[in-house]
Structure formats: C-alpha cells, structure tokens
Amino acid sequence: MANPLLLDIVLYLQSVNLVEGDGVDAFRDFTPDMPDQVVLLKEYVGSPAVPYDTMVNRSVQIKVRSKYADTARALALQIYKALYSDTTIVNFTSERWGQVHLRQPPFKVEVDKNDRILYGFNIGVSTTIE
C-alpha cells in the first residue's frame, strides 16, 4: 500500500531541503504548540472520483508558521515554487507523482494566540486514491 498523500508531500519537501522531516518541522493534520517554525499540511474536501478515470482530485492546504512574518512568507514561497512545474507534474516520491494545481500564491492566513504568523496556500493534486 502507498504512503498517505500528505506524507509523500512531506518526503518531497524533505528531498528538496525545505523541511527536516515528518514530525520534526513538518506536520500532517496536526498543529503542535512547538517548535515555533513549522510547515503544516492538511487535506480537505476534493472533487468526487469519476468512473472512467483512475485519478482523483484532492485538495491540500500548506501553511508555514514562524515568529517572523518575513520568514513564514519566504518559506511558504519557496515551497510554492518547489511545487511549480511547467508540466504541472511533480514526482513526490519514486512511487507517487501528481498533477499539482497551485490555486493561489502564499497569503497571510492568521496570527496565532502566541503571536506567530502563518502564511499558506492551497493546491489541488490529481493523483491516485491511496
């Protein structure tokens, strides 16, 4: 069985040196209190599967949190650019590729209760169901 999509995205970000690793500074469907600087990935409602296509359209929000707005924005922009491809195809791992649709550039999402700033963006990923 394949890895979950969010884990494959984290592994890809690790391979391009934008995160240290899953559960270190990148978290899936979980927001830890510490460390201050983290990358957060969450999958939300995508589009329904169609009977004639083996691919499904999934939606992912990627957020970067930091004590410094410039740092959060810069890392969010680096991740955004790492997911950009002229063909829209990104090879997350040797077992998973996806057609990535960048829905908007990074924007300021919120300031949390500890005055840390979050920048984020949303992507659509056409990939396998697993």
Features from the language model and the residues they span:
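Broad gene-expression machinery/nucleic-acid interaction feature
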Residues: 38, 59-61, 118-122
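Mid-chain, well-packed structural core segment of small domains
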Residues: 66-89
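Short glycine-rich, basic-tinged beta-strand/loop micro-motifs
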Residues: 53-66
